[in-house]
Amino acid sequence: PDEFAAQVFAALVDPLPRLVRAAVPAMITRRSGKILVIGSASALRGMKRASSYSAARGAQLAYVQAVGVELAPHQIQVNAIAQNFVENPTYFPAEVQANPRFQERLAREVPLGRLVAAREDAQFAAYLCSEAADCFVGQVFPVCGGWVGR
């Protein structure tokens, strides 16, 4: 289990500070920038058999919150979308979506009663990267059809 957790953190957490360190100098020079991390809502709601994954995703979101505050004086906004139940052919291929058991799960666990459309997710991400969202600093936005609140 420890080796698995280390692998998950190496894949999901360790690259994030390197990405920020690479992108931030030019943003500081410009006094402007946006970094939007696409994370997982599993960090916001416990799930069975996903402790290492959820912990790594939680570390990502904690990093976003901290570095967001650190970079805000430079007019750089760092935020995250914590998603689950978003249309994605990798996680939810057509055969999964058509399965009655999956439809029952959506009805039971997701107040929206359906997957969040990829278009909805993309439009929200575009908004967060626009000037209209300059006021958000180190925020984590669940995009999951209400799954986190249940």
Which residue ranges define each predicted feature?
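Catalytic loop of short-chain dehydrogenase/reductase
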Residues: 1, 34-59, 64-73, 85-86
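Catalytic Tyr-X3-Lys loop
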Residues: 1-20, 32, 36, 60, ...
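Structural signature of the Rossmann-like NAD(P)-dependent dehydrogenase/reductase core
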Residues: 12, 34-40, 77-82, 111, ...
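A short, exposed helix-loop element centered on a Lys and neighboring polar residues
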Residues: 20-21, 65
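Alpha-helical segment proximal to the catalytic Tyr-Lys
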Residues: 25, 69-73, 134
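Short C-terminal tail/terminal secondary-structure segment
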Residues: 45, 126, 137-150
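A glycine/serine/threonine-rich, flexible loop-to-helix segment
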Residues: 73, 83-109, 150
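A conserved structural motif in NAD(P)-dependent oxidoreductases
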Residues: 110-121
